[in-house]
Amino acid sequence: MHINVRGTRKIISNVSSFTPRYEFPKYSMPLTDFKGHQVKALKTFEKLLPQMNMIIELRDIRAPLSTRNVVFDRIARKEHDVMKLVVYTRKDLMPGNKPYIGKLKNWHEELGEKFILLDCRNKTDVRNLLKILEWQNYELETNGGYLPMGYRALITGMPNVGKSTLINSLRTIFHNQVNMGRKFKKVAKTGAEAGVTRATSEVIRVTSRNTESRNEIYLIDTPGIGVPGRVSDHNRMLGLALCGSVKNNLVDPIFQADYLLYLMNLQNLNDGRTELYPGSTNSPTNDIYDVLRRLQVNKSQNEKSTAIEWTNKWRLHGKGIIFDPEVLLNNDEFSYKNYVNDQLEKLGDLSYEGLSNKLKGNPNQVF
């Protein structure tokens, strides 16, 4: 998808002569990072779904389109009785943007989806998710739904969107409730790079039976799953790269840095007090090499290492930047519902026989 955001919002610059780019070049890059262990995980999903009461799909709040996986949409539509909850992670990196949250609300209402925002390390946020699980379990029990195997939720999402961190946080809360004073051991590996979890984990208990519920609640952690090349494009791949949802070396760091610069200038987050990059307040630029020269702390630092350092800083700690340019479009210029339906049409009907060949495809294919 080639996005032109010209005219979609008023761009105000402290430098009146500066005009941001409204289109981003199509650099040559892989468009998918789909791997063999992900195919195996998807086959496992099909077997597990009849046992599940809820699918929890995690997405990065900064990239609601890039981290939405159409494969999960297809799976969820096969199991109509399974509730799906979308959880946007890294809420702390998108503070106070009410218009954006309002747009997300409208998008999900179009599709009849439920969603919440949270910081996977924030105990209050995580407890709120636990309350949702407990309430859904309570409603099921109220309608006579005793579950001998417990209430089960499958945690899914793109690589490195916070699945394992969330599970560890939920497990920590449970551990502290039943084992006061005893040391807690993580049950799911976490990391700053995509691909830490590579296999579907054992069932993880997060609540016990009590006077209010006969059902225990269990979670199943899963590896991050990418998308096939035919439902990806340059914007999606660059958005995933900035989120850390693909391997660092898959997309050229200069391309990533240039995309970040493009998004920064488009969104005009500059409030006149904080520099997004050196000179952004007084001398904004569309030239990524100019920005990299400004960022270099010494002459021995090359452009790629500077680009990696800058994008990593924003990936981990940068606040307020949206990584999907479609979010900047007006409602009459971009339809979320049409976007999702188009993705489903491109994906087609999937059977799990021969799934490896169907999904892997050519990493550079765009159809």
UniProtKB/Swiss-Prot annotation:
CDD domains: YlqF
Major localization listed first in the record, in broad terms: mitochondrion
Subcellular location per the Swiss-Prot or TrEMBL entry: Mitochondrion inner membrane
Membrane topology label: Peripheral membrane protein
Gene3D superfamilies for the chain: P-loop containing nucleotide triphosphate hydrolases (3.40.50.300)
Gene Ontology MF term list: GTP binding; GTPase activity
Residues in CP-type G domain copies: 42-228
Binding site for GTP: 89-92, 160-165, 224
Keyword line: GTP-binding, Membrane, Mitochondrion, Mitochondrion inner membrane, Nucleotide-binding, Transit peptide
Family according to the record: Belongs to the TRAFAC class YlqF/YawG GTPase family. MTG1 subfamily.
Function: Mitochondrial GTPase involved in assembly of the large ribosomal subunit. Plays a role in expression of the mitochondrial translational machinery.
Other noteworthy facts: Present with 1630 molecules/cell in log phase SD medium.
UniProt-recorded name of the protein: Mitochondrial GTPase 1
Species of origin: Saccharomyces cerevisiae (strain ATCC 204508 / S288c)
